[in-house]
């Protein structure tokens, strides 16, 4: 086990592994911190990275089984202790590691008596067994068992199809999820006059990759989601004279807004891309809008006077305060 004393950076934002251990061949653990973060950022990152880790990291597993000795999934085979269903469940749990693409073939050819384990699977060169001792079946008599397998690399969870194929093959539930669990927690502290946060992230994997590798892949996936925004042409982000116009709906101070037009320099403002966090609103108004699920300037302007006054703790004079702030920051002329 590797464990380090916790030292928090006060300047540069950085990830750091503070604990790493191997509990078994199929259970790796890692604990990471990210700091320093502004208030609210830790929860944003924690939610996003957890979802990516649990749902979008690719894994490899057995997805299909075929054997002449299997009449149907809930049958038994003479000379084998486990039922066919139990064998399928054991094959489903086999942890594989690979860099393959598409679907690959594998097989088992075993003469009893004896125990069939993961090491008896004949694999393509691009696939490895993580734990050779994983149990598959106990052959109690001198019978010859031949099983053909399909191996696939994918992500998420896929439930087997209900129908069997005419060639005698059976789909099994596929769990392409090398990350077994993810927890995150947030520690708040004060640095000078500024409130900051530390994000603690715990990752458990099945041994086909380390928690550090999983975190790296999740971070890459998350970055790739935003790359189109970074490389898109400016025209895709800004309103043009005759395209993608936004009509300002009724607002608390609608009569004033009718006279004010969006500031037209070389670029027009894309209202959807302006978050209320950027407006430097008074804390009471900001919290009121957030609680009412108002996150962008467009969402703010999409509410009528009656709608806004229904928000808890929102007052008539708050509308004028918001308009004054928008004018000061030159969102309106």
UniProtKB/Swiss-Prot annotation:
GO cellular component, one term: mitochondrion
Compartments (UniProt record): Plastid, Chloroplast
UniProt cross-references to Gene3D superfamilies, sorted A to Z: 5' to 3' exonuclease, C-terminal subdomain, DNA-directed RNA polymerase, insert domain, RNA polymerase, RBP11-like subunit
InterPro entries from the UniProt entry: DNA-dir_RNA_pol_insert, DNA-dir_RNA_pol_RpoA/D/Rpb3, DNA-dir_RpoA, RBP11-like, RNAP_asu_C, RNApol_insert_sf
EC id: 2.7.7.6
Function: DNA-dependent RNA polymerase catalyzes the transcription of DNA into RNA using the four ribonucleoside triphosphates as substrates.
Similarity remark: Belongs to the RNA polymerase alpha chain family.
Domain notes: The N-terminal domain is essential for RNAP assembly and basal transcription, whereas the C-terminal domain is involved in interaction with transcriptional regulators and with upstream promoter elements.
The protein's name in its UniProt record: DNA-directed RNA polymerase subunit alpha
Protein's organism: Phaseolus vulgaris (Kidney bean)
């Amino acid at each position: 086990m590797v464990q380090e004393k916790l030292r928090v950076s006060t300047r540069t934002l950085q990830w750091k592994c503070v604990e790493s251990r191997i509990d078994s061949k199929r259970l790796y653990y890692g604990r990471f911190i990210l700091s320093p973060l502004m208030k609210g950022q830790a929860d944003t990152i924690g939610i996003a990275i957890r979802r990516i880790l649990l749902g979008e990291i690719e894994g490899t597993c057995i997805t299909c089984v075929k054997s002449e000795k299997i009449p149907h999934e809930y049958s038994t085979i003479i000379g084998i202790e486990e039922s066919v269903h139990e064998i399928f469940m054991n094959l489903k749990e086999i942890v594989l590691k690979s860099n393959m693409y598409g679907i690959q073939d594998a097989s088992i050819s075993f003469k009893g008596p004896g125990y069939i384990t993961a090491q008896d699977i004949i694999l393509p060169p691009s696939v490895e067994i993580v734990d050779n001792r994983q149990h598959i079946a106990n052959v109690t008599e001198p019978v010859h068992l031949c099983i053909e397998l399909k191996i696939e690399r994918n992500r998420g969870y896929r439930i087997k199809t209900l129908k069997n194929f005419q060639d005698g093959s059976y789909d099994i539930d596929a769990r392409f999820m090398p990350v077994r669990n993810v927890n995150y927690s947030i520690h708040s502290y004060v640095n000078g006059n500024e409130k900051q946060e530390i994000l603690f992230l715990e990752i458990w994997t099945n041994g086909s990759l380390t928690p550090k590798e999983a975190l790296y892949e999740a971070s890459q996936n998350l970055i790739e989601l935003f790359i189109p925004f970074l490389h898109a042409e400016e025209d895709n982000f800004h309103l043009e004279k005759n395209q993608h116009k936004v009509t300002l709906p009724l607002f608390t101070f609608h009569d004033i807004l009718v006279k004010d037009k969006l500031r037209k320099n070389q670029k027009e403002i894309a209202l959807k891309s302006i978050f209320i966090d950027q407006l430097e609103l008074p804390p009471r108004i900001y919290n009121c809008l957030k609680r009412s699920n108002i996150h962008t300037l467009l969402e703010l302007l999409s509410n009528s006077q009656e709608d806004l006054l229904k928000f808890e703790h929102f007052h008539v004079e708050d509308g004028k305060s918001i308009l004054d702030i928008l004018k000061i920051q030159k969102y309106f002329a």
